[in-house]
A protein has these predicted regions:
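Long, charged/polar, surface-exposed segments that mediate recognition or autoinhibition
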Residues: 86-153
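C-terminal motif of bacterial Sec signal peptides marking the signal peptidase cleavage site
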Residues: 16-19
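N-terminal leader/targeting segments
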Residues: 21-98, 104, 195-196
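Amphipathic N-proximal alpha-helical interface segments
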Residues: 75-110, 152-197
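Positively charged n-region of N-terminal signal peptides that target proteins for export
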Residues: 1-4, 8-9
Length: 197
């Protein structure tokens, strides 16, 4: 019995030492997006620990989520908001979303605003004719001139959101970016919205 306990203790010590090791997290650079999260930056192990299966699964999910969103959106250099870390992702039909959580307990809407500005510029560079619009089923679309035209604050919940549409490869895509007032989580959603023909 003592041998079994000693063996179990030794295995636990080895596993805990392995879990404590691994790559050190490096701080992200300044700016609104972290290029280390782009598709090109997903080849390494990043900040995950090799001995922790859950961490590795999250890293794989992270890389796949970025690839899915990049492919759907045409925005090949999507990064993460500065001061944020990957939290999770999901899909519903063809719609894809990625969530980011603040790296610290404090957060501000400035992070959302800066990230929205970076995505706005990427969409302008990607969109047909460089136009970001308010999509209407009637076909009479409003072209947004300024990022501030797409920003909405929901007074009852404190939620801040940006929404715009853009045309890519003959299809309208809806981009929504929102931040929870409770925990600061930022969610980016890309949704196919119908043919532009």
């Amino acid at each position: 019995m003592k041998r079994i306990l000693a063996l179990l203790l030794a295995m636990m010590m080895v596993l805990s030492l392995a879990a404590c090791g691994g790559n050190k997290e490096t701080p992200s650079g300044s700016g609104t997006t972290d290029p280390g999260t782009s598709q090109q930056g997903q080849t390494g192990s990043g900040t995950t620990k090799k001995a922790d299966g859950a961490q590795m699964d999250a890293a794989t999910d992270h890389a796949n989520s970025y690839t899915d969103v990049q492919t759907l959106s045409g925005l090949n250099t999507i990064g993460k908001p500065a001061g944020y870390k990957y939290k999770g992702s999901g899909e519903a039909g063809e719609t894809r979303h990625i969530r980011f959580a603040p790296e610290t307990d404090s957060f501000t809407v400035d992070s959302l605003d800066s990230y929205a500005a970076a995505l706005w510029n990427l969409c302008i560079d990607t969109a047909k004719d460089g136009e970001l619009i308010r999509y209407r089923l009637s076909g009479e679309h409003t072209v947004y001139e300024n990022l501030s035209d797409t920003r909405k604050v929901y007074e009852d919940s404190g939620l801040v959101a940006y929404v715009w549409w853009y045309e890519l490869n003959g299809e309208y895509l809806r981009l929504q970016l929102k931040q929870s007032a409770d925990d600061g989580v930022i969610e980016l959603t890309i949704e196919p919205y119908g043919s532009a023909e």
